[in-house]
Amino acid sequence: MPAEFLKIHPQTPEPRKIQHVVDCLRGGGVIVYPTDTVYGMGCDIHNARSVERVAKIKGIKPQKNDFSFICNDLSHIADYARVSNAAFKLMKKLLPGPYTFILEASNRVPKILNTNKKTIGIRVPNHAIPRQIVLLLDNPIITTSIKDDDDIMEYPTDPEEIFERFQHQVDIVIDGGYGGLLASTIINATTDDFATVREGAGVFASN
């Protein structure tokens, strides 16, 4: 059965549509959704089967995943990661925004996401759709690129093209308008040195 192609207003998401997406996630669904950078693929982080499904779509072993996840705000982050005072100040300055922070994972991170590295990537995007989804779901959602790591092509930006590509692999593709071309900037905040792991859409000068 093909995925549902669901148009949602990017600035003022319709509550009934957000509820529909959340119901899908609670039922083990996998979605493709817009962010403040590129389109992402995700599921409820507490549904191991759904996480495994995302890993299969990405062509990786679940135990080898490096999935990040989306939180609604800074207080939500503190539930899943250990955050130093310096890291909190930096995140308060930069978030919501196009950044992924690598942090030490807390015990609340599901085992399937807590790889041997014991760290986790966390985002608070400056985009209403994913944050409203997370807020209503009351759980973070996985965020991983819809582009393969070894794919030399640019990130897909047209929601209709994205739907054509993933309609037989996911449950809902959200059309929130055209996506960006740059992924998030990744900052390692496991120490207070704050090293840039990957340059992306967010501007940040490492210490």
Residue ranges of predicted features:
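Active-site-adjacent structural elements in enzyme catalytic cores
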Residues: 1-207
